[in-house]
Amino acid sequence: MSWYEKYNIVLNPPKRCSFACADNLTTILAEDGNNIRAILYSQPKKLKILQDFLATSRNKMFLYKILDDEIRRVLT
C-alpha cells in the first residue's frame, strides 16, 4: 500500500461566473483600459489566464464586446 492511498480529496465542481460577476468584470475592464493594458503587457502569465478564461466562458452572459480595443486586439 502506497502512502498516498490513505488520502481522499474531494473537490467541489467549479462555479460558473454569475451575471453580476461577469458584469462587474467587464465594467472594470471598460473603465480602466490603460491600467489593464499595462498589467497585461507586464504579466504575460495573467494574459494567458485571461485568454483561457475568455475562451472557456464565452457565452451570452459574458459581454466581452465592450472590452477595450487594445485588450481585444491582444486577446485575439
Curated annotation (Swiss-Prot):
Impact reported for C17S: Accumulation of reduced G4, L1, and F9
Impact after mutating C21S: Accumulation of reduced G4, L1, and F9
Keywords, ordered alphabetically: Disulfide bond, Late protein, Redox-active center
Intrachain disulfide bonds: C17-C21
Domain of life from the UniProt record: Viruses
Swiss-Prot/TrEMBL induction comment: Expressed in the late phase of the viral replicative cycle.
Signal peptide (UniProt feature, chain positions): none
Family as reported in the entry's similarity comment: Belongs to the orthopoxvirus OPG128 family.
Record note on quaternary structure: Interacts with sulfhydryl oxidase OPG072; this interaction involves formation of a transient disulfide-bonded intermediate, allowing disulfide bond transfer. Interacts with OPG088; this interaction involves formation of a transient disulfide-bonded intermediate, allowing disulfide bond transfer.
Stated role: Late protein which probably participates in disulfide bond formation by functioning as a thiol-disulfide transfer protein between membrane-associated OPG072 and OPG08. The complete pathway for formation of disulfide bonds in intracellular virion membrane proteins sequentially involves oxidation of OPG072, OPG128 and OPG08.
Protein name stated in the entry: Protein OPG128
Organism this protein belongs to: Vaccinia virus (strain Western Reserve)
